[in-house]
Each structure stands twice: as structure tokens, then as C-alpha cells.
């Protein structure tokens, strides 16, 4: 069982309850999707007590079906969800297509309406893609993929920057009933290789190069390096992002995007798929080190995406949603691609960073396109808060109605900065909690109706039945003013259908820790008003800039360095990124660093950058004589975390360690590193 959260965070609920901004309803051109808080309470109760009835109505209203479903979920009664490792099936016997729901129905209704607003890395680079044009582009690529032998159920690997062609790619893949497996374009060639092999992808779609923050990234070269060990990959489709003529190209295997698109006509019919057919794989970090291919299926995921987009953000067809998240992560999947397009809205796709060419970039985009909903990680907000309000003041942000936060809890002082300087007291902040595995929001305020507390994820979304469990006994803590681990009692439509090719691992990770519950991996509290607070991971995952990284994966990379004997990676608080990575490293017995210690540390960091990617690089390398272990050989990461947090007086009884004397040396090393 995970360790219990030691420090109580219930004092956080002293923050005054914030009511939704006055005039929220009047500032929308359209009537809100939910009338008031009482309506939420009524619908939420129905979604828990009678999920079949609730989700039947929602699925009929929000999705188009080629063949109507017979039953929203089976078994109808959620009391046996997760029993024996089983998950319910959703929308039994229904057939639909994700691309049709995201593109065709809106292209038919209004082909000239903008679907995607693209803002390039440079402020003068951008274009608008209408729903009609999007349908043509998606149809062309769908035909190209079909001609290359991609069929229903196959997986296609995607390694693209944040450009419109990335969205076209995802939609074309699901149009023909295949699965996309997007790999974040900041991952190393080794990480890309592992994901291509695990998903058994035979086609890769990429770009010649990428642009980010004024820098050029050799995207195609990374793909080529990965494919040296992926013999089953037949073809690579390459989009010309920069047009660099020196980019490596393998005739026969490699195909230029523009050549393939020119071969085909403007329409290709969507392939009907069953409700529970796979939609995509997205790899996330796991505590065992091997990345997990989280699988989402079609109908349940689509419904979760569209409902949360409409109700969390109050998105309407005439709205513009700017999600500042990459498609390499679940935030980009659900709230840059599927959510806004399923709702018939316009999605802003931003290639760059919040600091290039200066710290006003986000606000320039909001002003330029009159964005209505903005969704971002607290990491970016901390960076922009530190830069100062001078980068905000000259922009008109009055179009904003909703400000979202994602990836980690937002600190109260950042919440207030966001509210006062970006929302200017007129936009509603929704601090959302969810996971790659959940597909869509689990805990969140609903725009315009839910009171909020800075730092709290507020209340559950429809169909989500959260419980706080005692981490030791697994018993529910039913009252308010309690703290433990967060679990979900019954399944919701967009829950992952498992880990690709490894369902037992899914059971072991999420269902086995607490019988008859889905275990989130997070500590949580429910305050005296029933509001939920997320307290951080209780497993071996660190959260850096809103991205979950496996400590085991980083440790495995460090071991690749020739003098590293053992390593233990933990997260620690960082003002900018929320958490940063610290690596405790002990050297092989016959190795020493001498006076070259700083260069050796740099080499270790570079090893991680090469094996995983720059975002996973440790911020701190701590060379120690040994790691604290139990007599069975388990490394006590709890001790390492507490020493880093300055809580060496709270280590408890260390006499049971096999090597208790090493603890003082670790404390000394940490103190020296912090000087």
C-alpha cells in the first residue's frame, strides 16, 4: 500500500469561498450550458444513482451515431465495477466515428467556420483552417493511409510539433478506424523507439524539423535514429515544416506529405466503428519504468471529452478555446483536438512557448483572436507571474470568460494573480483534476456556476464518484474534514480500457491496491465543505511542469552511465515547475570522481536527456555513499524525500534500515548542495 500522507493540508480550506464572477451569463453570446448550481447538483445525483439513464440522454444529445446503441452501460448497476478486474462496457451495440463527430457534421452545417486557428512559433506565422477545409485535408490523408495498408485497428505513430497537420493526422487516422499513438515531440529517439515497438506501429507521421521558442529541432533525424531498431515500420510520412533540403530522406520508405495529399480527392467516407473499438494509445510514465500505453476507446472517450468541454468550460459553437498544451499529452488530445471540435467550437493551436519572443505571447494571442476560454498549466503561470504584469497590461483580455488550470494544483497566490491580472475579476477560474487514464476531467468547478476555493479542485464531474480512503486499511472515510488517498468508486465513460497488451499491469496499478475502487495514485483531502484538495502523488511518479515522469524510468537512464552503481529519483518542491527531479546516485565500488565531480554530474544529466528527453533531466544530482534500504533491499524513498524537504527531524525510526549510518551522510550531502 502507498505511504500515508504525513502533513495535513486541510488548513488550506481557510481560503474564502469565491463565487462565480457577476455577469458571467451576460458576457456569453449564448445561454449557458448549465443554468445554475442546483441544476448541477440534480444532474450529478442522477449520473451517480442512475448512470444508464443519464448517459443515455447525454450520448444521444451530444454525439451522432451511425447505429444507435441499445444500452448506455453494461452491467447497468455500477456496484460491481472493477470486480475481478472487469470494467463495464459502454454504449452497447452502437456504431459511430470520431472524425465524423469532430469534423463532418460541422462542415455540413457551416463549412466556412474556423475549426483551427494556428499560431506559429513566430508571431507572423499563422493560418486559419475552416471545418470545410479540415474535412478535405483529413479525407486526403485518410486515403493516403488506406493506400499504404493502414486498416481498422492498426496503430499509427505520430511524432509532430503543434501544427495544424498534427490535428489533421489524428483525425485522419481515426476516420479509417485506426488508432493514433502520439509521442510527444520532445521525447528522445530511444523513447520514441520504445513506444513504436510497444504499439506495433507500421507507419510513422512526422515533420522535417520543428520550431519551438526560436530554436530548430531535428525532428526527422530523431525519427530516423529511433527507426534503426524498428524493422517493422514500412513508411514515414514527412511534413515540410521548415523545408530544409538537408533533412535526411530515405526513398522508398519516406514519403513527402504534400506529394501524398496531392494524389487524392477532397472526400473519403468515415469508417463506422463499434462503441468500444480502440480510439488511441497514449503512453504515460509508470512506476515500474516501462511506459504504459494507456488505451482509450471510442464512444466513452468522445462523450467524456465533449461533456467536460461544454460544462467545465461552458464552450459553445461560437467560442474560441485556447488550450496551451501539446498533443503529446492528454491535455492536448482532449482539450485542443477532440473536445472543442466535438463541440463545434474553434481551437487555437499554438506551436511556441509562453516566453518567446517575450512573456506577452499568450496574452497577445488572446487579444488577437478574442479567445473565450484559456487553459494552461500552473508552471507557465508561475513563469509569467515572475516576469511581471507589464507583459499583460497592454492587451485587451475582456473576451475571456473562463480560465482553466491543469496538471497540478494551482497555488493560492498564483490563483489570485491569474484571477486579478488575466481574468481581471470577470473570468471564472476552473482548477481541473484528471489524468491520462481518466480521459477527461474527474474533479472540477463548472464555469459560471460552481463556487471555488483557490487551490481546490472543487467537486466531482458527472458520473465520477470520488472517495477518500484510509491508505492503510483501504476503508472509506465518509465524513468531511478527512485526508487519505483518492479513489473512484464506479467507472465513468472515458475511463481507460487498460494498458495496451498488458491488462494485468492495469489491474495491478489501478484496481488491485484497493479492491473495488479505481486508485488514482494521488493523496487527497475533503474539507469541511466537501471540496476536494489534491495533495500529490503517493506512488513513484514525479510531476514536473504538469507532466508525470516515472522515477524508475529516470533511474534506468542514469544506470546507463558507466560509473553509476545505483540511483534513486525523487521529486521535490520547485517554485517554477511545481516539482523538480533530484537523483541520489551511488557509484560503482571501483569508481571515483575525484575533482571532476561537476563534469560527471553533467554527464549523468546528459544521459537522461538522451535516453528520455530534456524535460526529464534531474535538476539536482546528489552523490552519496549508499542509499537507505530496508533489510529486504527496498530503497526507502520516503527518507530521501523528507531530507530534501528539510524534514530530517521527521524520519521516524531508521534503526530497522540495513544501513542506518548512511542517513546522516545523505543529510550532509543535501545540506551542502543547498548552500
From Swiss-Prot:
Residues 1-10 have a biased composition (Polar residues). CoA binds at residues 212-215, 331, 545, 609. One of its GO terms (biological process) is acetyl-CoA biosynthetic process from acetate. Residues 1-32 are annotated as: Disordered. Coiled coil: none annotated. GO terms for cellular component: cytosol. Its EC number is 6.2.1.1. It is an enzyme of class 6 (ligase). PROSITE patterns: AMP_BINDING. The keyword Lipoprotein does not apply. Transmembrane segments: none annotated. Belongs to the ATP-dependent AMP-binding enzyme family. This is Acetyl-coenzyme A synthetase 1.
Amino acid at each position: 500500500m502507498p505511504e500515508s500522507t504525513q502533513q495535513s493540508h486541510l488548513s488550506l480550506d481557510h481560503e474564502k469561498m469565491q463565487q462565480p464572477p457577476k455577469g458571467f451569463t451576460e458576457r456569453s453570446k449564448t445561454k449557458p450550458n448549465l443554468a445554475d448550481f442546483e441544476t448541477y447538483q440534480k444532474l450529478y445525483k442522477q449520473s451517480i444513482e442512475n448512470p444508464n439513464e443519464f448517459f443515455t440522454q447525454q450520448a444521444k444529445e451530444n454525439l451522432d451515431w451511425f447505429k444507435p446503441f441499445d444500452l448506455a452501460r453494461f452491467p447497468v448497476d455500477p456496484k460491481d465495477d472493477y470486480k475481478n478486474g472487469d470494467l463495464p462496457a459502454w454504449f452497447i451495440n452502437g456504431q459511430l466515428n470520431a472524425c465524423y463527430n469532430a469534423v463532418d457534421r460541422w462542415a455540413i452545417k457551416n463549412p466556412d467556420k474556423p475549426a483551427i486557428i494556428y499560431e506559429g512559433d513566430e508571431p507572423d506565422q499563422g493560418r486559419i483552417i475552416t471545418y470545410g477545409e479540415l474535412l478535405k485535408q483529413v479525407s486526403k490523408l485518410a486515403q493516403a493511409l488506406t493506400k499504404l495498408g493502414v486498416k481498422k485497428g492498426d496503430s499509427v505513430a505520430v511524432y509532430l510539433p503543434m501544427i495544424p497537420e498534427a490535428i489533421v493526422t489524428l483525425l485522419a487516422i481515426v476516420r479509417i478506424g485506426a488508432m493514433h499513438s502520439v509521442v510527444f515531440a520532445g521525447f528522445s529517439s530511444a523513447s520514441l523507439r520504445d513506444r513504436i515497438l510497444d504499439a506495433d506501429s507500421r507507419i510513422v507521421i512526422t515533420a522535417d524539423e520543428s520550431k519551438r521558442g526560436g530554436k530548430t529541432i531535428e525532428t526527422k533525424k530523431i525519427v530516423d535514429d529511433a527507426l534503426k531498431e524498428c524493422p517493422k515500420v514500412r513508411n514515414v510520412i514527412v511534413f515540410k515544416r521548415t523545408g530544409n533540403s538537408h533533412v535526411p530522406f530515405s526513398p522508398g520508405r519516406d514519403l513527402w506529405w504534400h506529394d501524398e495529399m496531392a494524389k487524392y480527392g477532397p472526400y473519403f467516407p468515415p469508417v463506422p466503428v463499434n462503441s468500444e473499438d480502440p480510439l488511441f494509445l497514449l503512453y504515460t510514465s509508470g512506476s515500474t519504468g516501462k511506459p504504459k500505453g494507456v488505451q482509450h476507446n471510442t464512444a466513452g472517450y468522445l462523450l467524456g471529452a465533449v461533456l467536460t468541454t461544454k460544462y467545465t468550460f461552458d464552450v459553445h459553437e461560437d467560442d474560441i478555446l485556447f488550450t496551451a498544451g501539446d498533443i503529446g499529452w492528454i491535455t492536448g488530445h482532449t482539450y485542443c483536438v477532440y473536445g472543442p471540435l466535438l463541440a463545434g467550437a474553434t481551437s487555437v493551436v499554438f506551436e511556441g512557448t509562453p516566453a518567446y519572443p517575450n512573456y506577452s505571447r499568450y496574452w497577445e494571442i488572446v487579444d488577437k483572436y478574442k479567445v473565450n476560454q484559456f487553459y494552461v498549466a500552473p508552471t507557465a503561470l508561475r513563469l509569467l507571474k515572475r516576469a511581471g504584469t507589464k507583459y499583460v497590461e497592454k492587451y485587451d483580455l475582456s473576451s475571456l470568460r473562463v480560465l482553466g488550470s491543469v496538471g497540478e494544483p494551482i497555488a493560492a497566490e498564483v490563483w489570485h494573480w491569474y484571477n486579478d491580472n488575466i481574468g481581471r475579476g470577470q473570468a471564472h477560474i476552473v482548477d481541473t483534476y484528471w489524468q491520462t487514464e481518466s480521459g477527461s476531467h474527474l474533479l472540477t468547478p463548472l464555469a459560471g456556476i460552481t463556487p471555488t476555493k483557490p487551490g481546490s479542485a472543487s467537486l466531482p464531474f458527472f458520473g465520477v464518484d470520488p472517495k477518500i480512503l484510509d491508505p492503510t486499511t483501504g476503508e472509506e472515510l465518509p465524513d468531511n474534514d478527512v485526508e487519505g488517498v483518492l479513489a473512484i468508486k464506479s467507472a465513468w465513460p472515458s475511463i481507460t480500457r487498460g494498458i495496451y497488451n498488458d491488462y494485468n499491469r492495469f489491474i495491478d496499478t489501478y484496481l488491485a491496491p484497493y479492491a473495488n475502487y479505481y486508485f488514482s495514485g494521488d493523496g487527497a483531502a475533503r474539507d469541511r465543505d466537501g471540496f476536494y484538495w489534491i495533495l500529490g502523488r503517493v506512488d513513484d511518479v514525479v510531476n514536473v511542469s504538469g507532466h508525470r515522469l516515472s522515477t524508475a524510468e529516470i533511474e534506468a537512464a542514469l544506470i546507463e552511465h558507466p560509473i553509476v552503481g545505483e540511483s534513486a529519483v525523487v521529486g521535490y518542491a520547485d517554485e517554477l515547475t511545481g516539482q523538480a527531479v533530484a537523483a541520489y546516485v551511488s557509484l560503482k565500488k571501483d569508481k571515483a570522481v575525484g575533482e571532476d565531480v561537476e563534469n560527471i554530474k553533467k554527464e549523468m544529466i546528459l544521459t537522461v536527456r538522451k535516453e528520455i528527453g530534456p524535460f526529464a533531466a534531474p535538476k539536482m544530482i546528489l552523490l552519496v555513499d549508499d542509499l537507505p534500504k530496508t533489510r529486504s533491499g527496498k530503497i526507502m524513498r520516503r527518507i530521501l524525500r523528507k531530507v530534501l524537504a528539510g524534514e530530517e527531524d521527521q524520519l521516524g525510526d531508521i534503526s530497522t534500515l540495513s544501513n542506518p549510518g548512511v542517513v546522516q551522510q545523505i543529510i550532509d550531502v543535501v545540506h551542502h548542495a543547498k548552500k
